[in-house]
Design a protein with these regions (language model features):
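Conserved, mostly hydrophobic/aromatic
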Residues: 56, 123, 152
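C-terminal beta-sandwich/jelly-roll accessory domains of carbohydrate-active enzymes
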Residues: 129-200
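Flexible loop/turn segments at secondary-structure boundaries
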Residues: 1, 64-66, 72-74, 130-133, ...
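Aromatic- and carboxylate-lined catalytic core of secreted/periplasmic carbohydrate-active enzymes
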Residues: 58-60, 64-101
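A general structural signal for short secondary-structure junctions and capping/turn motifs
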Residues: 28, 47, 112-116, 141-143, ...
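Carbohydrate-binding surface patches
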Residues: 102-146
């Protein structure tokens, strides 16, 4: 009912990125991502700027962060992340959302968005508080065309760092990605990946 009168809303004053994973997961059961404002803030500096930004970028991305708080690499990262979000916002804000792994069921979370024509998708994966040497399961994607082939590319990387995602820059069928999945989770705390999939 409220969305008849407002184009977006503030889910919570709590902007701790760990808490936001649970908050945004819950709100997404009812509200579309384009209606949920999510800002990068200074809350929980134990987490990286990358993690905080990747959490906020699964909704309507914003920043409430003093630029003087950021070092050169963090500032460059934020600029690149905003550019990627702007380039992909039609997928994130207007695409079909698939909730893949619930933070309420374990130590990880994953959400993805796909375009209606199934030619582009964005996958988000988050490691929250993994247990030591826990068994990591592949993330099985949804909403792809099983007959199409998709190029997998990890984006939103820190400057001078390389992706260690085994599937990075490789091509898989939609059928494989949905039935077998990709190994995107890690045993790192407060670790995130943003993965772009493009049909070839």
């Amino acid at each position: 009912e409220a969305l008849k009168y407002f184009t977006e809303f503030w889910c919570s004053d709590n902007t701790d990125p760990i808490e936001r994973l649970f908050i945004q997961w819950g709100f997404s059961q009812i509200f579309p991502s384009k209606a949920m404002s999510a800002h990068v803030t200074s809350w929980n500096k134990k987490t990286s700027v990358k993690f905080r930004t990747d959490v906020a970028s699964m909704c309507k991305l914003g920043f409430d962060l003093g630029l003087k708080e950021l070092n050169a690499d963090e500032l460059t990262y934020c600029q690149n992340a905003v550019a990627n979000w702007t380039r992909l916002k039609k997928v994130i804000l207007d695409g079909d959302q698939y909730r893949l792994v619930s933070p309420y069921d374990g130590n990880h979370m994953s959400v993805m968005y796909t375009t209606p024509d199934k030619n582009k998708a964005v996958l988000y994966t988050y490691d929250i508080h993994p247990r030591y040497a826990e068994k990591l399961l592949p993330v099985k994607l949804q909403g792809l065309d099983p007959s199409k082939r998709y190029k997998v590319k990890e984006i939103n990387l820190m400057p001078n760092s390389k992706s260690n995602l085994a599937a990075n820059e490789k091509t898989y069928s939609g059928d494989y990605l949905m039935k077998v999945g990709i190994n995107a989770f890690t045993t790192n705390q407060a670790f995130s990946r943003v993965i772009e999939l493009t049909a070839e």
